[in-house]
Regions:
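Short, flexible helix-loop junctions that flank or precede catalytic/ligand sites
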Residues: 1-375
């Protein structure tokens, strides 16, 4: 293990390799070679394990002097940066067992279209809403930022509005098109989400993107901004529409929750929940998507604290207004042989229901495959 920091490669070369291999993430840590995340799995580069001097040299090469000083104080730092002709990157530098480590994620310069992302067409319609709250949810690495970027780009391309994004850090860059887009980064442009949201209404926005609703104050601000005639996009680390609604309501003290349910029932325009799933028999991943678009019945269920009944509304809402449960999305991907049964069942929210869907398909397939009578 090289302890001298006399590297045979630099961070730029590693990031270039990361992009060329189609990795979503790269990890730099002591005792292991640089590791790439490809299609969700960790893959080591054919390089020797790194020592603490090397990991610090690699990670610090991405930082300004000001950022280095900030890191030395807190032992962790979020940042984003771009390399011309290659890609943008989001990074978190941190310490583990006394040594510097880093996680780097690719962010393409070009914003993908909805067709390229595999997002249902109904999701793009959220860009035309005049006001309200749209939630994009899912676990880390499920493509939430990419879907949000596509929505912002569609508004930016088609409408003459003022868009403000509040991000930690800024990921996709949005040039002014028909709209103007002001992108604010936590740390460099504003103290925090709470601070930025306190002043955002004075900045005359039409659309506000909140990178992540992390706490009560941020959630409360998102509801207020959407209630006052603005369109708000935000993310949550939840796995479905029902858990997203519960997360928002449960963030408030019990004596405020009835009022919050009423407010949410009025402003919520939709919930999109995403999961990236390994493609069967080929490299890459495909998107599983749950979409919930509140109708009168769903708004009433939110208001009356009967959120658990929303699932049945989503099950029957697929043909009427484009809603679908995650199970319906998984079943569609499985029936088209895009994902394996094992991967689908691992991610199914209502496993018994999903098994019945699969058994129904198997029964129909065996029925249709029977030879005609008399042969």
């Amino acid at each position: 293990m090289n302890q001298s920091g006399d590297l045979k490669f630099n961070l730029h070369q590693l990031l270039k390799t990361m992009v060329e291999k189609g990795a979503s993430d790269m990890h730099i840590t002591t005792g292991a070679p640089p590791m790439l995340r490809i299609d969700g799995a960790m893959v080591p580069l054919k390089l020797p394990p790194l020592g603490p001097v090397e990991t610090k040299a690699l990670c610090f090469s991405a930082l300004s002097e000001e950022q280095k000083a900030q890191f030395e104080k807190s032992n962790e730092l979020d940042l984003s940066f771009g390399i011309k002709g290659l890609s943008r990157f989001r990074s978190n530098i941190f310490t583990q067992r006394g040594a510097v480590a880093g996680a780097f994620r690719t962010i393409p310069f070009r914003v993908s279209t909805f067709d390229e992302l595999g997002v249902p067409a109904i999701v793009s319609d959220f860009s035309n809403k005049p006001n309200g709250l749209v939630l994009i949810t899912g676990p880390t690495g499920s493509g939430k930022s990419t879907t949000l970027a596509a929505l912002i780009d569609k508004i930016n391309t088609e409408q003459r509005l003022h868009i403000i994004t509040i991000e930690d850090p800024i990921e996709f860059l949005h040039p002014h098109k028909l709209s103007i887009v002001n992108q604010r980064e936590i740390g460099s442009d504003t103290e925090g989400f709470k601070h930025a949201l306190r002043y955002v209404l004075r900045q005359d926005p039409d659309v506000v993107l909140i990178g992540e609703m992390r706490d009560l104050e941020t959630i409360e601000a998102a509801l207020t901004i959407s209630e006052t005639g603005h369109l708000v996009f935000a993310t949550l680390h939840t796995n479905g529409a029902i858990s997203s609604i519960n997360r928002i309501v449960d963030a408030f003290p019990p004596h405020h929750q009835s009022q919050v349910r009423t407010k949410l029932s009025l402003v919520l325009q939709g919930v999109v929940s995403q999961q990236l799933i390994p493609r069967m028999g080929a490299p890459g991943r495909v998107l599983g998507v749950e979409t919930m678009i509140p109708n009168a019945a769903i708004r009433n269920l939110i208001r009356e604290d009967k959120v658990h009944q929303i699932y049945s509304q989503m099950q029957v809402g697929q043909e009427k207004n484009g809603m679908q449960t995650l199970n319906q999305s998984l079943y569609s991907l499985y029936s088209r042989r895009l994902i394996s049964l094992e991967e689908a069942m691992t991610r199914a929210i209502e496993l018994d229901e999903f098994k019945m869907m699969v058994e129904g398909r198997t029964t129909m397939a065996s029925h249709h495959s029977r030879p005609p009578m008399g042969r």
